[in-house]
Amino acid sequence: MPWDTEAFLSSLISVSDATASVYKRDLNAFINWSAETDVHEPEDVSRRHIRHYLAWLQEKNYARRTIARKTSALRRYFRWAQQIGVTSTDPCIEIQAALGEGRLPRVLKQQEIKVLLDSPRASVLDQDGPRRLRDDAVLELLYGSGLRVSELCALTLKSFDFEKNLVRVLGKGNKERLVPLSQKSVKALNAWISEGRPEFLTLERSHESLFVNLRGKPLTPRDLRRLIDRRALSPTNPHAFRHTYATHLLDGGADLREVQELLGHADLGSTQIYTHVSKERLKRVHKDTHPRA
């Protein structure tokens, strides 16, 4: 088969099965569209052909986020195709898809961060000690290292190197990465591990999971959402911590590819949305503060 999509999909060792399935569907849609325009082999795909396809998707009223996802699949395919010699060039170079669906990832405001991390609401001040230590450690880790919810819930005691202040994270597609720990995260984690966690465990329910619920079982994504609901001033999605982490890194001058590595993104396009978030925030600051804005 000229497109050799099965070989491409087999090469995707750093993505989940669900992502690979989406790539397969998006590639097949592109191949079928290309055939209708008399383009039957990947070598015949030009940059103009890609642009025409994206324009066609827009005319068909596909959501901007869907177009961005389809573009990501094409980028990865043609990068692979050029590397193994299926094509002589990469027609997706300099091709950019529309970002998002009009709504950018939510970034927590400084006051929200302060309430969540430094001065919890009065209603949670009377929590029992162990749960408070756990919640503090969870929130510091979410904001300080930008972990996904699934990644945080999967952490074990062996995930950490406190001598180097690093955490080993198992991300999408079982891809491992090392992420630095903030000083406040280290302090909160040490308090939880030494003082809080033992209170939740007994000999009958001893295991390696770092975070556990009141029954001594591993913390679940649902448990984590409830934890955040108790601390937040307004409804807050756990993923907002990851968005805030990435945006604050870029605001502080971090390189885009460094942020990509810290987040565990397989494709740089997934990280680029945060540059857009940063630009939008700068525009709002300018509009709100400059007398001639």
Language-model region placement:
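Conserved catalytic core of the tyrosine transesterase superfamily
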Residues: 1-293
